[in-house]
Amino acid sequence: MSFENRPFVKKDLLRVLSQYPTFLNESKELVSKLPLNAKGLHRINFANGRITLSLIYGDLNETLDELKNPLVKYDAWYLDGFSPAKNPEMWTAEIASYMAAASHSETTFSTYTVAGFVKQNFEKENFSLSKLKGFGNKRSMLAGRSSSTQKKVIVKKKTIGIVGAGIAGCSLAKILAGRGHNVIIFDKEDGPSKAATGNPFLVAYPRLSAHDSPYARFSLHSYLFSSRFYDDMNTKFWKKSGVLMLGFDENSLKRETALCNARKDEVLFEKLSKKSASEKAGFKINHGGLFFKDAGYIDPERLCEEMVDDVLIEKKFKEEVQVIVKKSDHFSLKTKNDEYVLDHVCLCNAFMVNQFTNLRGISKKRGQVSYISTNATLKNLKFPICAAGYLSPKNGDKHLIGSSYSKSDSTKLIQTEHDENLEKINIIYDQNIELKGGRVGFRTVTRDRLPLAGVIDGIHINVGHGSKGSTSAPLCSEYIADLIDGTVPPVDSFVAKALKPDRFKIRN
């Protein structure tokens, strides 16, 4: 974990790291994954998830409260700041107290400063201290050890059952297997991503706000994490094409203006005029917008198949879970054919989650995607365009447009919903549109449009991603994996509280 109040821009960090040619490859990977300057906690994975960096952008004293977690203890602290005389806010008694509370019996710390008041702060927290010879051009340094009686927690390899093989379930399976756990994933369909997700195309992009709120912070950080997550897979089923979001009405233009006023560096997005948007798309568009270069689209079924292609993941497709029973030290999960003994159970089964729980604030929404024929104008479109609806790049001989949003339970294509999709797409493209069918799927949405991620009665929950699962699910899966392991979570307490699965019960 690292706190950075004034983060490097990439070109400056490259210049600094160039002084250490021994670590050239590691330096390049770090710089390539360095998140943009946005307040909050960023999770970066290296070595196929075996090494994690939790990078917190913001003032140390302001962010500490958001990171307090009684279950997480750190092995070592390294305090590297300007001298206390120049940077006194980093060396406060409150920080020493936080470090003591977040340490176990084997935790150590070190720092180059040996200032008297710094030593006093750590002595008050019962750290044992030693003044040592410094390193390099430093004359001396301070080292210490925690006096905590809390034992260090060793992460043990476990057997974990996942119910549901959509993006949420498959990304969680991949992350857990990457950490060495044995995973059994169950789904009543004959393969991954067959039910709620189902479409051959999903856009991965953020819905941002210029204001700091749980929704805004989660939307930004899940977008940045999902883009890195798919990059790390090195898969052909993720296209980092960028996504163009048009400013087409009063609300979208107001949001666009607020975002542009909040971020002027064009690192997160590039503002395009109507002319520039048309040139980039390859056909005339009547609106400008924001182009998100790190966004893109996935083939969810093929991508999910890759995610669960691991020797540590046992796939139980066409096997519906019937009963889950919590025992004193394990779970018993029963299907029609067998019974499984598991250390943990994770429910990633969308609107079927209440077969085993009693969650409030969630509902099932129908979504119909329409297919239109490609043509000489559209065939060269390389990235999705979003407005009231979306237009995809070519998929075979067609494009996807959509999507409707209704309470209907019908699995049949409905002409009025095709008409609704065609009306939405007219904002983007209104020439020579030929309808070629479509597909119906169902989403699980929540009352506040944030997913449900966390633990209830010992069962881990990862549902309620709505139409944004391609963006939101990977970060929630990383969060669930850290809850299971008792390691540093990838979201701060501000966001974790907003994701709590029982939050609607609490509000009621």
Q: Which residues does each PLM region occupy?
A:
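A short glycine-rich, Lys/Arg-flanked "PGG" loop and its adjoining helix->strand segment in the class I
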Residues: 92-105
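Dinucleotide-binding Rossmann-like beta1-alpha1 core, especially the glycine-rich loop
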Residues: 201-280
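Active-site substrate-recognition segment that forms the wall
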Residues: 141-143, 149-156, 161-179, 188, ...
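Helix-loop-beta segment of a Rossmann-like dinucleotide-binding subdomain
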Residues: 210, 235-245, 268-308, 404-408, ...
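Short beta-strand to alpha-helix junction loop
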Residues: 110, 214-222, 248-254, 289-306, ...
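Helical element adjacent to the flavin cofactor pocket in flavoenzyme catalytic cores
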Residues: 290-336, 340, 344, 348
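C-terminal catalytic lobe of FAD-dependent flavoproteins
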Residues: 267-269, 433-508
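S-adenosyl-L-methionine
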Residues: 16-67
